[in-house]
């Protein structure tokens, strides 16, 4: 695991542009993105969530924090993001989810998977709508826009006598009055679409218990081994306790016929 040097760590506190550029340089590597975001949080730099009205393709500095770059969301291409940014610049912010779909519909990279991942990653949260509501209606909204475009191409007139070829927007699709996803469900969605937990961390409720059990933060161990004068607190072969979420695990038999487990733990 790569760690920033102490000089770089000090730099990131006062130079958020440096960290934003560093994150943008590893956009295609979710493990590296997660690593550098952890460094940002250690430095006290806030990670701002993805937002269709504020995010760019890469990570950018905003209000003392770093805004999440949309390229880091799965199934979101640069062409789609650049079109989105042009529409914002030319016609102003997207006013609603349906306004976003209407204005972005003719983008060649616009598809249901891209829209769904924007919803699941929280990129529409600032519009004060629930992710559960958008997940319920997004396909209906896109299908309604497609049907409206088809009718316009065919030259059909609406009740107000719009000329053939004009873009008659479909009626606003009402949002169902349903509960929002739980915090755990939202975090799981974020992890699936970005490789990261953005709105929180599943371990947050267990950190106090982990400390009581004597669990050692992994960054404390790594910092000790990366110190210029060598490890002081820890040593090779030492048994320690850590706490985290097991994301993958497999067992194997050693040459001595002993059973061992290899686990990937997200902390």
Residue ranges: model-predicted function:
Residues 1-2:
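Short, well-ordered junction/capping motifs at the entry into regular secondary structure
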Residues 267:
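Calmodulin-binding IQ motif helices
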Residues 6-10, 14-264:
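Noncatalytic, beta-rich nucleic-acid-contacting surfaces in large DNA/RNA-processing enzymes
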């Amino acid at each position: 695991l790569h760690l920033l040097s102490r000089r770089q760590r000090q730099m990131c506190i006062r130079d958020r542009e440096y960290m934003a550029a560093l994150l943008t340089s590893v956009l295609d590597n979710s493990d590296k993105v997660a690593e550098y975001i952890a460094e940002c949080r250690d430095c006290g730099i806030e990670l701002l969530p993805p937002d269709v009205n504020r995010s760019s393709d890469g990570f950018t500095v905003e209000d003392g924090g770093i805004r999440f770059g949309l390229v880091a969301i799965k199934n979101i291409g640069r062409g789609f993001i650049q079109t989105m940014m042009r529409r914002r610049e030319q016609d102003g912010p997207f006013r609603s989810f349906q306004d976003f779909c209407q204005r972005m519909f003719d983008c060649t990279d616009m598809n249901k998977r891209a829209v769904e991942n924007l919803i699941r990653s929280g990129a529409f949260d600032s519009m004060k709508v629930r992710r559960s509501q958008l997940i319920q209606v997004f396909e209906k909204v896109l299908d309604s826009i497609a049907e409206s475009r088809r009718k316009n191409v065919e030259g059909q007139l609406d009740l107000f006598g719009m000329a053939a070829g004009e873009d008659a927007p479909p009626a606003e699709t009402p949002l169902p009055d349903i509960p929002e996803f739980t915090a755990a469900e939202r975090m799981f969605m974020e992890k699936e679409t970005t490789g990261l937990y953005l709105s929180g961390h599943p371990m947050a409720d267990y950190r106090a218990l982990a400390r009581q059990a004597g669990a050692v933060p992994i960054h404390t161990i790594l910092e000790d081994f990366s110190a210029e004068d060598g490890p002081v607190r820890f040593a090779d072969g030492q048994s320690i306790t850590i706490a985290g979420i097991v994301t993958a695990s497999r067992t194997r038999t050693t040459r001595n016929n002993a059973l061992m487990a290899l686990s990937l733990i997200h902390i």
